[in-house]
Amino acid sequence: MDQHYRGDIRVGRGFTAVRCVGNFIRKRRKQKTVTDIYVDGGTRGSRICLVDKSENKTIIKTRGGDLTNNELEYLAVLYALDYINNRHKKDNITIYSDSKLIVNQINGEWRITTDRLQPLYDKCMKRMTSKIKIKWIGRDSNLAGIILED
């Protein structure tokens, strides 16, 4: 069989550059991108923070009102879910939080016993998809938490 190479594209009998490029594009579409998002909420300054490692992006929002730390943690996750649904629809997402309460409630391992958290939990669950996972990490590893502490 007569074949030769031009750059990365093999050209020869029954094997054209167009077919090769088409196969490459189809394979790339099937590959899933993994995105890591770090979130945190803190009562000092009533702020939430989101760090998107894939885009090297940090977002800090100030929230008004008399909110507890757990409410701010939920608001950070809600903001992350809205951010994800607008930017990373095709990606596999992992949200990292240092709040065991929030992570375990969203993962269905712990019950919600505070009436103020129930509506926030419900909003989170409406926005969650099968491509989004939420995991707990220690405070020292949470990039968003480190930023909020400064």
What are these regions (language model features)?
Residues 15, 19-71, 82-83:
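RNase H-like nuclease fold core
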Residues 73, 77:
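Short, conserved alpha-helix that lines the donor NDP-sugar binding/gating region
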Residues 5, 64-65, 112:
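Generic detector of short alpha-helix boundary/capping microenvironments
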Residues 42-44, 78-150:
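RNase H catalytic domain
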